Amino acid sequence: MNGILNVYKPIGITSFDVVCQIKKITGIKKIGHTGTLDPLACGVLPVCIGKGTKVVDYLMKDFKVYDATFKLGIITDTYDREGKELSISEVNVSLDEIECAVNSFLGDSFQVPPMYSALKVNGKRLYELAREGKSIEREARPITIYDINILHIDIPYVKFRVKCSKGTYIRSLCYDIGSNLKCGATMWDLERVQSGAFTKENSIELNKLTTDNINDYIISIDESLNQYDKAFVSSKCEKLLVNGVRIGDKRLLPNLDINKMYRIYSEDNKFLGLGMRNSKGLKIEKLLL
């Protein structure tokens, strides 16, 4: 059993809990997910099984889409409603001011991750330090907000949809919006509705998966990587590529763009893996036979 499951994680369990349940259903130990969702959050959680674990890093690079709600006028230590209240403020902002603050985060920026996060500093996770009562300076990291739109406002609650790059913390985004409005904000609800090619509409609820039906929902490895274009190679190229050879002879190569990742297939449509051509030739970057 090899491939990817587009699982819909319910509220109240960890992403690791999802992996454990899939292990019990399949009896397979080699399983991993492609991006943590906190227990408070629900939504799309692609789970890689067997050889599918080889593409975890590639799937994690994909954009994410979230529906999130924040509450104005409150700040907590975790930046979400499960944390300890640090401050409560009056909310005296207009709808236009809220819209302007939210839209100001569109594009490239730097974001400081929350203390309650799984990032490591000197070998220790930030949330472990936070639980010890320690707060350390965190380096701001580059993120991209590709799109952000307000869905509903019922002050003090604001619901919005955001399409963002890997590594974006929605809790921090809510906190930063609140800071911009000078009244504070805390994330109240979070749903991941898309992770790259994996959407909420095409997901399967965790409690509906069984030993009998799980195969019906497994997506093949090459299909899960459909953000990369297909490229076909001759049988001669196939043998060389599979053995780790970089092919520099242009007479043997398909017409491929330089420094662009492709899904490489044999003449008989067998998926070989991910490959890239540079100035020296074509080579398989990740063999997935």
From Swiss-Prot:
Coiled coil: none annotated. Signal peptide: none annotated. It comes from Clostridium novyi (strain NT). InterPro entries: PsdUridine_synth_cat_dom_sf (IPR020103), PsdUridine_synth_N (IPR002501), tRNA_psdUridine_synth_TruB (IPR014780), TruB_C (IPR032819). Responsible for synthesis of pseudouridine from uracil-55 in the psi GC loop of transfer RNAs. This is tRNA pseudouridine synthase B. It is an enzyme of class 5 (isomerase). One of its GO terms (biological process) is mRNA pseudouridine synthesis. The keyword Isomerase applies. GO terms for molecular function: RNA binding; tRNA pseudouridine(55) synthase activity. Pfam families: TruB_C_2, TruB_N. It comes from the Bacteria. The active site is at D38. Keywords: Isomerase, tRNA processing. It catalyses: uridine(55) in tRNA = pseudouridine(55) in tRNA. HAMAP family: TruB_bact (MF_01080). Belongs to the pseudouridine synthase TruB family. Type 1 subfamily. Its EC number is 5.4.99.25. The lineage of its organism: Bacteria, Bacillati, Bacillota, Clostridia, Eubacteriales. Transmembrane segments: none annotated.
